Amino acid sequence: MEKIENTKKLTETLSNKKVKYIVGTTLLSVIGIALPRVFHVIAGSTAGATFLPMHIAVLIAALTFGVTSSTIVAGSSIVCSYLLTGMPTLARLPYMLIELVIYAILLGIFNKKFNSYISLIATIILGRVLYAGVLFAAINVIGLPTYGISVIESIKVGIPGIIIQLACVPVIAKIMNERLNLKND
């Protein structure tokens, strides 16, 4: 009888965790679509490149739910945002998708070994290096146009967004993990 009760409790716990995971991933995807729009309305058309609002939802998902969730948030945010708002532009969409998926994977992996701040800093640095490699390959190996996308320029323009990420993302993820009683996947 005790074994049946323990199995029932385990099933309930797994079910609750799965629901939190699905709902959390969905909400962060919606935030990944809405937040860039809010920034564009408040701060103008260059707000996305400056404040990196779409990155925020992906990074929070990685620290809260792990690699799978953050990759889903990255893909769904980019594609749905484009379909609903036309942002990012179609020319920029594949590069931004690759960039956000790189961040999702790196942060999800690093967060299993290091604290959230170290993980986030390492992700931002290594993510930019890998993104530079993607752009290099797109230009020099595959011959794709990059439409003036520059890693160095994106870092300079995105410094306010990087500061926001470092200041807010680990705190928000910590609060979510505590409130939801989750460990990432």
Q: PLM features: what roles do these ranges have?
A:
Residues 72-112:
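Helix-adjacent hinge/juxtasegments
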Residues 2-63, 68-69, 103-111, 169, 173:
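Hydrophobic transmembrane alpha-helices
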Residues 6, 40-48, 86-94, 113-185:
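Membrane-embedded alpha-helical hairpins and interfacial helices in multi-pass inner-membrane proteins
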Residues 64-65, 159:
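Transmembrane helix irregularities
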Residues 19-28, 50, 54, 68-73, ...:
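Alpha-helical transmembrane segments of integral membrane proteins
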Residues 55-59, 96-104, 166:
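Alpha-helical transmembrane segments of multi-pass membrane proteins
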Residues 32, 36, 40, 62, ...:
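Structural signal for membrane-spanning alpha-helices in multi-pass inner-membrane proteins
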